Every structure is written in structure tokens, then in C-alpha cells.
Amino acid sequence: MKKKNNHFMNTLKSFGSALLVIAILIAAYGIYHAPTSDASQLKAELEQNERELAKEEATPANPPENTPAGTTAATHSAATGVPDISQSSISVIGDSVFLGAAPAFKKLYKNAVIDAKVSRQVVQALDIVKNMDKKGKLGDTVIIALGTNGNFNSATGQKLIDYLGPDRTIYWIDAYGRNLPVQRDVNNTIRRVAKANNNVHVIAWSKEGPKHPDWFYQDGIHLNITGQKKFAKFVRKNMITE
């Protein structure tokens, strides 16, 4: 009888172990399959967007539409104290977050010049804007969409703003990621730089992003198709109402 009980208990243990292994395999599939799928789709999107932006970079910059001769956003702002985005040439310096949203933003501002790359950091931005300026592609309105990939100090940010000058309207989109370690430090630095410069305005993506987890891919940083469109509209809304 004892042997039968032992056999029964061993059978239960074996069955329980098998169920545990199956449960672990199912959980592992759920954890790893979705992010891999997301990563593949995101990679394809970013590569496609980079190719499209590279084509545009090879062509001369278009002047902003419906802009009266001799009128720029800078002169309008100086006269009224309010940036006029409708009469502005827009340039964007961004990382992979903005690269993903580039097509959606171009639908809102088709003449915007976007220079966005994967893994880009703020410390690289000064050389980028100098190159854009040399090519005549640095607009009256500049959007800085950097900070996700690493911290920087106020001096680095100020050098960038100094080069862009006081006559440009500058929007700096702050950083957000569901588990982004540098977010707090980066955003504090962005706000310090903005506070020191009247023409720099912060677009608080870090406050809007957390409200919409369904806009993001699995990594909680990059945006899916829906999120890209919403992000572009959020940026536009903040540029208009700033």
C-alpha cells in the first residue's frame, strides 16, 4: 500500500513538474515573442524613414508656403511677441523617437526639414545644426527632440542654443520612457536651459506620454503607428499654443 502511495505521489509530482515547465514556456513565449515582433517592426519603420529623410536631404530646402516676401517667424515674433508657426520654416533635430514620427509630422508640416537618427544624443546636436546651417536648412523655428539616449549638462545645451541664436523660436521636446533611467536628470537640464533663454520653450512629452500606454511599442519609449500620429499632433498643438 505504501509503495502504491509513493508511486501515486511521484506521479503527481511528475505531472506537476510537467505543468510547471509548460507554464514557464508559455510565459516565456509571451514575454519574448511580442517584444521581438515589436522590435522587428520598429526597426523596419526606422530604416524606411531614414531612407526617406536621406532622399529629402539630397534636395534643396523648400521655402515655407504662404510666407509674404520679407516676412519670417522671427520678425513676426519680434513685432508681436507671439511665434507665428504658419509663417515659419521648421527644422527638427531628433533621435529615433522623432525618426519614427517623422512621416506623421511631415503630413502636418510638409516643408519641415527633419534630421533624426537612431541613438543620437544632445552632445552631437551642435555639429548637426552647424551642418544644417551650412546647407541653408536651418529654419526660423527649431525643434530639438533629443535626450532619450543620455544625459548632458547645461553648458552643452547652452552652446547649442547660443549657436541657434535669440531670433529663432526653439521648442525642446523633453524625454519620456516607461523605464528610462536618465529621464529626470535630462528633463531637469532641459528646463534649466529653457529658463535661461526666453526663446526656448519646453514641450512636456513626459507629462502626456504616460497617459497613453497604448501609443507605445513594448519598450515604452518608441511610438507605434497610432502613437506617432498622436505625438505629431501633440507637438503641433504645443507649438501653436505656446
Language model features with spans:
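Conserved SGNH/GDSL esterase-like catalytic core that processes O-acyl groups on lipids
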Residues: 83-156, 177-184
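Loop/turn elements at helix/coil->beta-strand transitions in domains of secreted/extracellular proteins
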Residues: 87-88, 110-112, 137-142, 165-171, ...
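Internal catalytic-core helix/loop-beta-alpha segment
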Residues: 150-153, 161-162, 170-172
